[in-house]
Amino acid sequence: MKKLLILGCLLASFAGFAQNEESLKEAELNRFKVMVAKDLPGLQAVLHKDLVYFHSSGVQDNKDSYIASVASGKSSYVAITPEEMQQRVYGKTGINTGILSILQQAADGSQTTIRLRFTDVFVYADK
């Protein structure tokens, strides 16, 4: 079984993850789905123990603090929509780049949409 680390914006793990562009894209889209669903067990499963996650604000989280922020509602995503995505795979390293439109919800229920560029670096490693 393989574990996938995403550095830069994220570290995550995906079992049986093939090292090609299409599966790299699927892994990224699955991560977005789990984040929007506030699926804490799903986040626990897909995020690597060495997660480094940088928010658009510059705030940095590790795995535990990121999952806690989702659980508390501090990080609350209503929708994550890729506008552009490009995948590159170099041996055991995969890079996703692109532009996202993210609909966020604040604790008071107000919603804002942010548009941002992202880079996620995936490194394939044994589990």
Regions inferred by a protein language model and the residue ranges of each:
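N-terminal signal peptide c-region/cleavage motif recognized by signal peptidases
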Residues: 13-15
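Acidic/polar active-site rim loop that often engages polyanionic ligands
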Residues: 10
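A beta-strand edge to alpha-helix "cap/lid" segment located at domain peripheries
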Residues: 4-7, 19-45, 50-127
